[in-house]
Amino acid sequence: MAVAPPLPPAPARQLRRWKGSSPRPPPWLSSPFRRTRYLSRPAFAAGGRQDYSPSSGMGVSKTGAFRLGLYGNLNVQSSVQEWVDETKRLFFLRTTNSVRNNITNGTTPLRVGNLRHDPSEDIRSSNYPSLYNQRERGPSNSIVNRHVDTDLAKHRVMYQSAHAVPAPFSVVNNDIKPLNMLDGSKEEIPWHDSVTMESSLPKVSKSEKTLVVDKAIPDKKEHKRITRKVTPNFPDKASLSTESKNARKLLATIYDKVLVVDNVESARSVVKLLTTKYKGFIHACDTEVANIDVKEETPVGHGEVICFSICSGNSDGEADFGNGKTCIWVDVLDGGRDVLMEFAPFFEDPFIKKVWHNYSFDIHVIENCGIKVAGFHADTMHLARLWDSSRRTDGGYSLEGLTNDYRVMDAVLKDIPKTGKVSMKTIFGRKKVRKDGSEGKTISIEPVEKLQREDRELWICYSSLDSMSTLKLYESLKNKLEAKEWIFDDCPRGTMYDFYEEYWRPFGALLVKMETEGVLVDRAYLSEIEKAAVTERELAADKFRKWASKHCPDAKYMNVNSDNQIRQLFFGGIENRNKRGETWPQSKTFKVPNDEGIATEGKKTPKSRTIKLFTIVEDLKIDMFTPTGWPSVSGDVLRSLAGKIPTDHIYKIDDGQEFDEDGSSLELPEQDIEDTSPYGTAYEAFGGGKKGREACHAIAALCEVFSIDKLISGFIVPLQGDRISCKEGRIHCSLNINTETGRLSARTPNLQNQPALEKDRYKIRHAFVAAPGNTLIVADYGQLELRILAHLTNCKSMLEAFKAGGDFHSRTAMNMYQHVRDAVEEKKVLLEWHPQPGQDKPPVPLLKDAFGAERRKAKMLNFSIAYGKTAVGLSWDWKVSVREARDTLKLWYRDRKEVSAWQKKQKAFALEKCEVYTLLGRSRQFPNMTHAGPGQKGHVERAAINAPVQGSAADVAMCAMLEIERNARLKELGWRLLLQVHDEVILEGPTESAEEAKTIVVECMSKPFYGTNILKVDLAVDAKYAKSWYAAK
């Protein structure tokens, strides 16, 4: 049994009444909703004013019989079930009228979740939003027009019965007077043959107004009222926003320009036009794809094309496919594979020029269907990057961002309102509705296949606009690039669109080809190293917990990945840098998983437990803070606390200490440690000596946890996933020209971010292997950026050092430090050593061994100078004063005055022209510096030095890849490019021709500019071949 809360009686308002005794009312009182079987079941109804009734017109006589009021649709010949159904309806009406009465006669609106109006809450509720705002007028006797939301009222009073069979509903309150009776009237409607209504309905309590849902109600028991919270059935999504409505109206205007192709016959006629009459046009193409997560999955082997659009045009205008239709929209969602295949002659024709936005994605999903796409003419994303490489932070390179930007589309200004791309989120996104009926912040979008089926016309307009916008964007960017001069080696070479045609168009096609090839991954090996990594991670975490638990007992249960728990151990009591007076507490409780199964006797084992952590050290030096003002516990901070502890020492328990099974320590004789330089700031903070060493080793173990977690989550686990690979087990990462310098970036997965070889502790590169019968060639440039810097600056010292060969960084150290030079000249050390037969070691130490500190500084300076680093940055790297770092810089520049002069020239040029150029003539733009502050100017000056060096290195790598791709002999041997990672390329081909192929690759990379080298220095290339990437390094 479910019982509703009592409802307040509504004040009666007299309406016109009918007191006739005939079961059939006069025509002027007929209900517009009377039954169709009128003759056999004449309706009992009465009219009223066209608004609402404050009273439901339902009550109980002194004998307990129901009296029907104004809205009864029954007569004495009606069946019991009809009375039951009508009773329900009257109850809903009574509830609704009570709601309306509260709104009309009360002083405040009704609030969500409250049907009972309490005048004492009028003031308190003044800030609540109104539930009902207006009344709608309609036909008399219409329930719909007696409240704003019937369903809402229903759900506020209806309670589901536990029984399968619906039961009668009864509202009992002797104070309720029917509208067709004056006060004191005893008229009531009798049953047929003088049977009262009471005899056919269950007994109900008259003591209080109750909603009862049950088969029967006991006569002799007082009913206990039960309240149950009922959530109204609000819609899942909010209504469209004004922005969305306006966007939809504008979008719908292009529908008349779209030709819908959804059958084979119309597809054939369209393809005939595309391949004959309009073959010489530029064709902008775009696809819409279902069943793919574009952020996580590769399009190679994933996704399903549900539709595509083609918009064609030339310098004279757009193509006309009949009746002014300028765009084709092709439906291939439900059984449209045959329609798609009809377009194979169009997609596969290399002489039909096709432009795309994000070409690599569209071509992969089309080729998943068995069509080999050819005729690549342009990718508007690449054109936009070539025109302005700095848009990543100023509008971006999305189709929406580009086509709605006046600066981009001003070449086709008149078409901007028609061609500006509108996002799917704007058109189809709706905010979710919370349980209380208010709008949430989360915007959701229905699956694209559902949108195409259920909102077809709008979806056709949305998806067709992609190709329309792409065509206009191509025209605008082409005009801009044709208006921009291409300067190569200080000489005019044509326009930047000529540069695109010569370099970036074939490079874009090559990158897509490399993505399609992919690289084979040994998942069994990855699974093995994952187990090893997890084991070592747990060992390191346990070591830290055991050490910390000596100072704070509950630390053995702590979560080592929790920043707050780590901060609690090391930085309790520290004041927030942003909020003066607010400090991190000295102790704090945390909830952690109850892995030990600790439970109170007689109770269930809880999933979590509470631990208390307190600060275990005081006065730790703090150099870094989070944006919220608390001390940072990042990897860099923890490494500065730990120092440089060798990895093999980390997995030992502690220097001079062992632990027994219960975690207590077994003291061993303390060892003498002469050199404390490897230890970090924690050594002194924990008192030095044995305790300081233990602290540094434990914190180093914590750093190790973070490092292993990064390898597991960033490389080992993702490389085993199906989302980035296809059925053959090859990984297909996305290669993009989307960096400001022109360097490639990679995602899903980011193979550009592989750990450095010396830090690749699990040898992850061993997992990248050649297919059976094949071999990998790995070729890498040596010190490419430094050689580029020597060429651009024409630095005599650097050119001579590269010409002499050997260890460039050792030569730099020799030129910087006089005592190192003296040692070389006196033959106390050697710059480099080439062993002869029978020689095991050099006759005297090598410079890199005897003067390791000086060489490390020289090496860091070599790369830092190329990246535009200043004395301030170097002082942070070396942990020295700015003055000392500046003095070291002067030593470097002493023999390299040409570099200093070139850097000053680049800074001035960038501030004046707001751009700098790479070796091949690509530009890197900067914002106007007229009103820029010192910080922004400093950033531009560093970028003005870095961009030409890194950008030129990217030019060299690109030309080398194109040279390899053009080589006919490599194609004949069956070798193909797979990856480019920074200055390194990876190829795969037959094992039997590996040696010959390696020689050709080295030649191509050494002379990347159409078989020549235009630089003033040689390009050193190191190449090997093996079965795995790691083995070939």
Curated annotation (Swiss-Prot):
It catalyses: DNA(n) + a 2'-deoxyribonucleoside 5'-triphosphate = DNA(n+1) + diphosphate. The keyword Disulfide bond does not apply. It comes from the Eukaryota. This is DNA polymerase I A, chloroplastic. The lineage of its organism: Eukaryota, Viridiplantae, Streptophyta, Embryophyta, Tracheophyta. Residues 696-1030 are annotated as: Polymerase. GO terms for biological process: DNA-templated DNA replication; double-strand break repair. Residues 321-482 form the 3'-5' exonuclease domain. Residues 125-142 have a biased composition (Polar residues).
